[in-house]
Every structure is written in structure tokens, then in C-alpha cells.
């Protein structure tokens, strides 16, 4: 059952909780107050341990930093991507990189930049059966831009939210798989790949 609390009501710091509220309801304010409460009352932090405050956007990081000006040395505020990269990918990725033929010597983390030049699309199309029927290269590019890692019930798949077509024919999964293989062989790790490889590392090395 849900418990309704006022934003200035301290919670037990060893108890899990979830906040559900609409825009402008004071979620960030409540979170800041809770962080301060943990800093003031925790018996486990000591002098060297820090609180990890993980958000999904850089704007969230900046907002929280701005509201905790005196706690920078005790609170690590970062996005989920930077947290996973610094604490999982950077120190441990080399354990699984060979499985994916990832060119670690060229590794570059990028956001939404995709390898979709004419040459890249040509190479990717060679992984599709009956390649000659997929003539609309722009549709293939759009399919890649629409794709994300999603859990299909057994594993993660890189694919669009719904089947997409090129020249009236549904683009097969092999095309999306080929893109990831192509990007990794060129040392490109997209933001979503940070989540993907972190998941793979935690599953293989729990």
C-alpha cells in the first residue's frame, strides 16, 4: 500500500521507497532534503564514503548540483550512463570486449551519432537475404535512428519499436544486428550500448 508523506517529513534512511508525483510537485526538492537527511544521520557513511545520486539527464545533474553547493565532496551526482561507464565499463569492459569484436583501441562513446554513410549502408545491406529488394536506403537509415535496445523476453535486441519497411518489405533483425557489429568493429559505443554492456557484465560477473 502507498504511504502519503509531506515533502518535509524525514523518511527512514535504511528503507526503500519510490516517489510518484506530477511535474512541479516538488520531487527534486524532496530528494535534496532526503540526501541532506542521510548525510546528517547515517552511521554507515563515515568520512570517506559518498552518496551516489543517479539521474537520467544532464539537466537533472546540474539542478541537483546547484541545490547541494556545500556537499560536492560527499555526494556523487551523475547520469546513469556516466555512472555505469565510470564504474563498470571503464574498469571491466575489456573482459567481454573480444566476444563482440569491439575495437577497444578505437573506442569512442557517442550519443545519437550513427554510422549511416552510403558505404556503411551498403555493407549493412549485404547482411540481408534478398538484399536487392531493399532499395530505399533512407528508410533503412530511419529504421536505425528509431532503434533502441529492448528486452524481448529472453535477451536484449537492438530494434525499432515496431516493424519498419524499406521498399514495402519489412527490414529483418539481421540488419539491426549487423549495424551493431559494424559500429563495434569501428570502436563506436552508443549511450544505449553503455547500458547494454553494463547489463552483460553484471550478468556474467555478478
What residues fall within each predicted segment?
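Accessory N-terminal region flanking or inserted into the helicase ATPase core
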Residues: 1-25, 29-30, 50, 122-206
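P-loop NTPase Walker
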Residues: 1-96
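Residue-level detector of solvent-exposed, low-hydrophobicity positions
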Residues: 36-37, 63, 90, 109, ...
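A sequence-level detector of short, solvent-exposed, charge-rich linear segments
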Residues: 38, 83, 99-103, 107, ...
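Conserved P-loop NTPase-based nucleic-acid remodeling module centered on helicase motor cores
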Residues: 49-50, 58-141, 177
Amino acid at each position: 500500500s502507498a504511504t502519503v508523506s509531506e515533502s518535509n517529513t524525514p523518511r527512514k534512511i535504511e528503507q526503500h521507497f519510490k516517489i510518484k508525483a506530477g511535474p512541479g510537485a516538488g520531487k527534486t526538492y524532496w530528494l535534496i532534503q532526503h540526501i541532506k537527511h542521510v548525510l546528517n544521520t547515517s552511521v554507515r557513511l563515515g568520512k570517506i564514503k559518498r552518496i551516489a545520486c543517479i539521474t537520467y539527464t544532464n539537466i537533472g545533474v546540474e539542478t541537483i548540483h546547484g541545490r547541494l553547493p556545500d556537499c560536492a565532496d560527499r555526494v556523487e551526482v551523475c547520469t546513469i550512463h556516466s555512472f555505469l561507464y565510470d564504474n563498470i565499463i571503464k574498469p571491466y569492459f575489456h573482459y567481454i570486449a573480444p566476444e563482440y569484436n569491439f575495437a577497444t583501441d578505437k573506442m569512442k562513446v557517442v550519443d545519437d551519432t550513427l554510422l549511416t554513410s552510403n558505404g556503411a549502408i551498403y555493407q549493412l545491406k549485404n547482411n540481408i537475404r534478398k538484399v536487392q529488394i531493399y532499395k530505399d536506403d533512407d528508410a533503412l537509415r530511419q529504421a536505425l535512428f528509431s532503434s533502441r535496445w529492448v528486452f524481448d523476453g529472453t535477451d536484449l535486441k537492438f530494434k525499432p519499436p515496431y516493424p519498419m519497411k524499406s521498399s514495402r518489405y519489412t527490414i529483418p533483425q539481421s540488419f539491426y544486428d549487423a549495424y551493431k557489429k559494424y559500429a563495434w568493429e569501428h570502436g563506436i559505443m552508443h549511450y544505449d550500448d553503455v547500458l547494454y554492456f553494463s547489463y552483460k557484465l553484471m550478468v556474467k560477473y555478478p
